[in-house]
């Protein structure tokens, strides 16, 4: 509350003016979210990696993937950090050449979710502006290897040294057919031909910060198949499967439910998505299928998949031109996919998302994070009306065609939350989330959000740092 003191020689009056909920910083608001048994849900932020832990100016934290890298039974995190604090990697500038900087980091997990061992496995010209990573056992030695998509140049394969994964240098190969050929934004591993060895699938958007000339040129989504030693450039074969204006996704998912992995592609320039149907067999045969959407446009950068309406078909969930929504797969192949609104976090820009049953009611909910615009290293010129760094979740209404309830968690002046991964990290029976945080130096890095359940409402968000980019209220 605000206290205003008014006094005269005869009278002293204290006037109490309540602070409106609209002016309360989001993270400080008492949570209204509850579990299925009536307990209140709030969140505690924990730091896994940041500039202090790294010992250098770690920034531009972007994609992350999870797997047991050292085979000790605990999940580890591979994260990429774009080092783009001094320039806006989302804005075209033909007169500026970004420096070839960036880091690929691993946080090795333990039995305690607050104890991690962090190392760098690639940096600089090996990993210039890394955007995404994928993990799979490519060489068949039982240890997951890493592929990284870098926006300033290429794909790089990093081979796990096995028992020495925490201490030894990781052998590497820049895939020769990708070097200097564009800007790689997404990469995935999948065994498309069921031969027991994964292929890499990547989208080349042509330029890190595409301008009009880049949008006018179609660049490929490609499959990279390896036969032989993956550290030998001659062992890799590239097959382009389609060309698009700024393709920004190439995700393997069995979208048609026939038991093999298809590939979803997304085009920023064309504002559309499509998929390549895997025709099966011992050779990779793919046929492109349109995804015609009624009610919204989708560019397909970040999407998740679930049978939202319970009809036995996977639906697509993601940011659209109308807000966060889900797109219902039709019963008949070739028919239109229909858009259904979940909600918006306007004026903030939704980018990262994950699905999980957050409130333990048996239904899938959706966690979403935004992409803050404006300065990345300073808070002073940012106000509540801009696109800020928000985290929120949407509660499933059971009837998914109805309104989803939005529960805001945090809204800081700066923060990009590009990806979330659901995990019960503290093994207490509720869902927590891993994430990266960018656009907010010196607070970038890797975090986890612990779900807290209490009998009485608490502040929605407990920050890990005393000093951070300030929490902001919602816009009226």
Which positions does each model-derived feature cover?
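Bacterial N-terminal signal peptides that target proteins for export
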Residues: 1-7
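Bacterial N-terminal signal peptides
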Residues: 7-17
């Amino acid at each position: 509350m605000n206290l205003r003191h008014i006094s005269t020689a005869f009278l002293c009056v204290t006037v109490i003016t309540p602070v409106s909920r609209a002016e309360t910083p989001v993270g400080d608001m008492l949570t209204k979210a509850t579990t299925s048994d009536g307990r209140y849900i709030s969140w505690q932020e924990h730091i896994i990696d940041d500039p202090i832990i790294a010992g250098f100016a770690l920034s531009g934290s972007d994609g992350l993937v999870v797997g047991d890298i050292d085979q000790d039974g605990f999940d580890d995190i591979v994260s990429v950090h774009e080092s783009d604090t001094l320039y806006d990697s989302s804005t075209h500038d033909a007169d500026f050449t970004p420096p070839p900087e960036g880091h690929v980091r691993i946080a090795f997990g333990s039995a305690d979710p607050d104890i991690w061992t962090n190392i760098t496995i690639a940096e600089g010209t090996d990993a210039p502006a890394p955007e995404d990573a994928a993990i799979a056992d490519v060489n068949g030695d039982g240890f997951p290897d890493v592929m990284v998509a870098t926006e300033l140049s290429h794909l790089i394969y990093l081979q796990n040294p096995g028992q020495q994964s925490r201490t030894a240098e990781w052998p590497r190969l820049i895939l020769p057919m990708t070097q200097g050929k564009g800007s790689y934004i997404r990469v995935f591993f999948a065994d498309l031909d069921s031969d027991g060895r994964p292929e890499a699938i990547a989208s080349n958007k042509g330029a890190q910060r595409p301008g009009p000339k880049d949008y006018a040129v179609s660049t490929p989504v490609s499959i990279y198949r390896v036969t032989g030693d993956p550290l030998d450039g001659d062992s890799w074969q590239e097959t382009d499967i389609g060309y698009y204006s700024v393709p920004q996704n190439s995700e393997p998912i069995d979208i048609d439910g026939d038991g093999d992995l298809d590939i979803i592609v997304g085009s920023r320039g064309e504002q559309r998505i499509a998929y390549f149907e895997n025709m099966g067999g011992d050779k990779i045969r793919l046929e492109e299928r349109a995804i015609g959407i009624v009610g919204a446009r989708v560019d397909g950068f970040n999407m998740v998949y679930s049978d939202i309406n319970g009809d036995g078909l996977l639906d697509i969930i993601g940011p659209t031109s109308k807000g966060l929504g889900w797109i219902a797969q039709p019963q008949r192949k070739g028919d239109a996919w229909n858009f259904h609104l979940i909600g918006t976090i306007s004026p903030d820009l939704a980018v990262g998302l994950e699905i999980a049953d957050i409130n333990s009611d048996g239904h899938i909910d959706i966690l979403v994070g935004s992409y803050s615009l404006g300065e990345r290293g300073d808070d002073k010129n940012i106000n509540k009306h801009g696109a800020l760094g928000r985290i929120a979740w949407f509660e499933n209404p059971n009837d998914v065609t109805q309104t989803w309830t939005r529960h805001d968690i945090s809204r800081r002046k700066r923060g990009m939350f590009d990806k979330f991964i659901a995990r019960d990290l503290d093994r207490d029976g509720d869902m927590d989330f891993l994430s990266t945080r960018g656009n907010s130096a010196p607070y970038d890095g890797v975090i986890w959000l612990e779900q807290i359940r209490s009998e009485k409402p608490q502040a929605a968000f407990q920050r890990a740092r005393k000093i951070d980019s300030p929490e902001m209220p919602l816009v009226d």
